[in-house]
Amino acid sequence: MPNLVLDPLLKKLQACLESDVAEPFLTVLLDAMAVAMLVDAKCRASIHGFEGRYVFKTPDKKVGATAVFGGSHMSVSHQAIDRPEPNVTVTFRNPKALMELLLSRTPDLIGAMLKQDVNVDGNLNYLYRFAFLARHLQLMATRCA
């Protein structure tokens, strides 16, 4: 059954994935993920009992966002907020590097760090969990398109 709130965001995410322009990727991904957690019981169940705070940013801080998980909900800020202390901070060279890392079938975090595409400060398991959620959302987007 179509969802009037989530489906347009999933289509926008799919358009980001199909284009070469990665700039809006982080914003679209986080917005779609937050809505999916609200309206989809399976997505909500995947974060049940999970508490985590993520900060994503570029080194120049021109692109940044914060995602907070808690109480089976997710909230998003479209800026990097370092207080209170995040569980993981991901500094990425550019939005394309972040997109490639998060949406890879087998995320090679160590390889991305060695290539200096990303720098991770905090618990790497949080990033792997986020990548899993992003891949799940990508699959939802391909089904919606």
Regions found by a protein language model. Give the residues of each.
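Feature captures hydrophobic
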Residues: 1-145
